[in-house]
Protein backbone atom coordinates (compact mmCIF):
# COMPACT_ATOMS: atom_id res chain seq x y z
CA UNK A 1 0.00 0.00 0.00
CA UNK A 2 1.23 3.52 -0.80
CA UNK A 3 0.84 5.80 2.22
CA UNK A 4 1.51 9.55 2.17
CA UNK A 5 2.42 11.61 5.25
CA UNK A 6 1.86 15.35 5.69
CA UNK A 7 2.27 17.32 8.92
CA UNK A 8 2.04 20.98 9.82
CA UNK A 9 5.11 22.33 11.60
CA UNK A 10 3.53 22.04 15.05
CA UNK A 11 2.45 18.46 14.31
CA UNK A 12 5.69 17.07 12.87
CA UNK A 13 6.80 15.67 16.22
CA UNK A 14 3.42 13.94 16.59
CA UNK A 15 3.86 12.43 13.11
CA UNK A 16 7.30 11.14 14.13
CA UNK A 17 5.84 9.61 17.31
CA UNK A 18 3.03 8.01 15.28
CA UNK A 19 5.46 6.55 12.75
CA UNK A 20 7.73 5.30 15.53
CA UNK A 21 4.84 3.64 17.35
CA UNK A 22 3.58 1.93 14.18
CA UNK A 23 6.94 1.35 12.54
CA UNK A 24 6.39 -2.41 12.25
CA UNK A 25 3.18 -1.82 10.30
CA UNK A 26 4.46 1.09 8.22
CA UNK A 27 7.59 -0.85 7.24
CA UNK A 28 5.39 -3.19 5.20
CA UNK A 29 4.18 -0.31 3.02
CA UNK A 30 5.63 2.28 0.66
CA UNK A 31 5.84 5.69 2.33
CA UNK A 32 5.98 9.14 0.77
CA UNK A 33 5.77 12.59 2.32
CA UNK A 34 6.28 16.26 1.78
CA UNK A 35 9.99 17.12 1.94
CA UNK A 36 10.53 18.26 5.52
CA UNK A 37 8.09 15.81 7.08
CA UNK A 38 9.57 12.93 5.10
CA UNK A 39 13.15 13.74 6.06
CA UNK A 40 12.23 14.05 9.72
CA UNK A 41 10.31 10.75 9.74
CA UNK A 42 13.08 8.92 7.87
CA UNK A 43 15.79 10.29 10.17
CA UNK A 44 13.85 9.46 13.34
CA UNK A 45 12.57 6.01 12.37
CA UNK A 46 14.92 4.66 9.72
CA UNK A 47 11.92 4.00 7.48
CA UNK A 48 12.45 4.68 3.78
CA UNK A 49 10.35 7.66 2.69
CA UNK A 50 10.08 9.00 -0.86
CA UNK A 51 9.99 12.78 -0.84
CA UNK A 52 7.65 15.11 -2.67
CA UNK A 53 8.61 18.76 -3.00
CA UNK A 54 8.16 21.04 -0.03
CA UNK A 55 4.71 22.48 0.53
CA UNK A 56 5.75 25.90 -0.76
CA UNK A 57 7.23 24.37 -3.91
CA UNK A 58 4.19 22.36 -4.98
CA UNK A 59 4.33 19.27 -2.79
CA UNK A 60 0.59 19.24 -2.16
CA UNK A 61 -0.09 19.51 -5.88
CA UNK A 62 2.17 16.52 -6.51
CA UNK A 63 0.25 14.54 -3.90
CA UNK A 64 -3.11 15.62 -5.33
CA UNK A 65 -2.06 14.41 -8.78
CA UNK A 66 -0.93 11.04 -7.41
CA UNK A 67 -4.24 10.66 -5.58
CA UNK A 68 -6.11 11.46 -8.81
CA UNK A 69 -4.14 8.77 -10.67
CA UNK A 70 -4.80 6.20 -7.91
CA UNK A 71 -1.11 6.02 -7.01
CA UNK A 72 -1.73 6.77 -3.32
CA UNK A 73 -3.84 4.46 -1.17
CA UNK A 74 -3.99 6.35 2.14
CA UNK A 75 -3.10 9.85 3.38
CA UNK A 76 -2.26 11.00 6.90
CA UNK A 77 -2.47 14.79 7.29
CA UNK A 78 -1.73 15.95 10.82
CA UNK A 79 -3.02 19.52 10.83
CA UNK A 80 -2.66 22.32 13.33
CA UNK A 81 -6.22 23.58 13.85
CA UNK A 82 -4.81 26.83 15.25
CA UNK A 83 -2.62 27.61 12.25
CA UNK A 84 -3.51 30.88 10.61
CA UNK A 85 -2.33 30.34 7.05
CA UNK A 86 -5.18 30.60 4.51
CA UNK A 87 -2.99 29.27 1.67
CA UNK A 88 -1.99 26.21 3.69
CA UNK A 89 -5.60 25.63 4.69
CA UNK A 90 -6.69 25.79 1.05
CA UNK A 91 -4.01 23.26 0.06
CA UNK A 92 -5.13 20.87 2.80
CA UNK A 93 -8.78 21.21 1.78
CA UNK A 94 -7.84 20.51 -1.84
CA UNK A 95 -5.97 17.35 -0.84
CA UNK A 96 -8.89 16.17 1.29
CA UNK A 97 -11.22 16.94 -1.63
CA UNK A 98 -9.05 14.83 -3.96
CA UNK A 99 -9.09 11.98 -1.44
CA UNK A 100 -12.87 12.20 -1.16
CA UNK A 101 -13.30 12.39 -4.93
CA UNK A 102 -11.11 9.35 -5.54
CA UNK A 103 -12.19 7.35 -2.48
CA UNK A 104 -8.80 7.45 -0.76
CA UNK A 105 -8.92 7.17 3.05
CA UNK A 106 -7.54 10.27 4.78
CA UNK A 107 -6.83 10.88 8.47
CA UNK A 108 -6.43 14.41 9.81
CA UNK A 109 -5.58 13.63 13.43
CA UNK A 110 -3.96 10.97 15.58
CA UNK A 111 -7.18 9.15 16.49
CA UNK A 112 -8.32 8.73 12.89
CA UNK A 113 -4.80 7.76 11.80
CA UNK A 114 -4.70 5.00 14.41
CA UNK A 115 -8.08 3.71 13.22
CA UNK A 116 -6.80 3.52 9.64
CA UNK A 117 -3.40 2.01 10.41
CA UNK A 118 -4.86 -0.67 12.67
CA UNK A 119 -7.54 -1.54 10.11
List where the protein language model places each region.
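Short hydrophobic/aromatic-enriched beta-strand-loop microsegments
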Residues: 30, 47-57
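Short internal beta-strands
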Residues: 28-37
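Ser/Thr/Gly-rich flexible loops in soluble cytosolic domains mediating phosphotransfer, phosphorylation
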Residues: 92-119
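Mid-chain, well-packed structural core segment of small domains
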Residues: 59-97
Amino acid sequence: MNITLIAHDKKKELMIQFCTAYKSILSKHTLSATATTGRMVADATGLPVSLFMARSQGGYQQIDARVAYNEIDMVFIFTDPNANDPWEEQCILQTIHQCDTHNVPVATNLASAEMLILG
